[in-house]
Amino acid sequence: MAKEEPPSVSRDLQELQRKLGLLLESFLNNSKVVAFMKSPVGRFLDRHPFVTLTVLMFVTMSAIPVGFFLLIVVLTSLGALMGAILLEGLVISVCGLSLLCVLCGLGFLSLALSGIAMMSYVVVSCLMSYWFSPSRPLTQQNANVDCQLAMKFTESERLIF
């Protein structure tokens, strides 16, 4: 039985060698490979098989680290994109709350200024109607006396209440 296995193994190896030869021939007859082999880089690699093997091994072994690096770059970019979106949302929220506070403050300030303006209008119109009433003519001296009396009257009211 030991003598029967070697002819079978040798036939299998010959078949494998023939298939690899056909594969190599079809590979070398490919138009893109022919164009590459006619280029200066292809001619250099054809004349220097050790360099060709070294480059082939380097490219093969560097595929996994380059793949991991590209994966990390993509994941970091996605993380940065999400971080920028979250940061943008945070900035918009903080600015929105700041704007709300400023607008509320301006609303209260406008209410206070409107109240002061309305009270000033009422006081000035009452004083104008009192000073310049058609029923009694006032002189400058009488107006000053009336203002002083009004001031004393309001001070006495403050003391009473």
Curated annotation (Swiss-Prot):
- The principal localisation class reads endoplasmic reticulum
Induction comment from the UniProt entry of this chain? In liver with hepatic adiposis caused by PPAR gamma 1 overexpression. Up-regulated during adipogenesis.
> Membrane side Cytoplasmic: which residues?
1-43, 88-93, 134-161
Q: In which tissues is it expressed?
A: Prominently expressed in the heart and kidney. Expressed at higher levels in white fat as compared to brown fat and skeletal muscle. Expressed at lower levels in lung, liver and testis.
Q: Which of the residues are on side Lumenal?
A: 62-67, 111-116
Any keyword Iron? Answer: no
Q: Which InterPro entries match?
A: LDAF1 (IPR029709)
Q: Give its localization.
A: Endoplasmic reticulum membrane; Lipid droplet
For this record, an example GO cellular component is: lipid droplet
Q: Which UniProt keywords apply?
A: Endoplasmic reticulum, Lipid droplet, Membrane, Transmembrane, Transmembrane helix
Q: Name one GO biological process term.
A: lipid droplet formation
The membrane topology of this protein is: Multi-pass membrane protein
Q: Which segments cross the bilayer?
A: 44-61, 68-87, 94-110, 117-133
Q: Which domain of life is it from?
A: Eukaryota
Subunit and interaction comment: Interacts with BSCL2/seipin to form an oligomeric complex.
Q: What does this protein do?
A: Plays an important role in the formation of lipid droplets (LD) which are storage organelles at the center of lipid and energy homeostasis. In association with BSCL2/seipin, defines the sites of LD formation in the endoplasmic reticulum.
Q: Which family does it belong to?
A: Belongs to the LDAF1 family.
Q: What is this protein called?
A: Lipid droplet assembly factor 1
- Specify the species: Mus musculus
Taxon lineage: Eukaryota, Metazoa, Chordata, Craniata, Vertebrata
**Gene behind this chain?**
Ldaf1
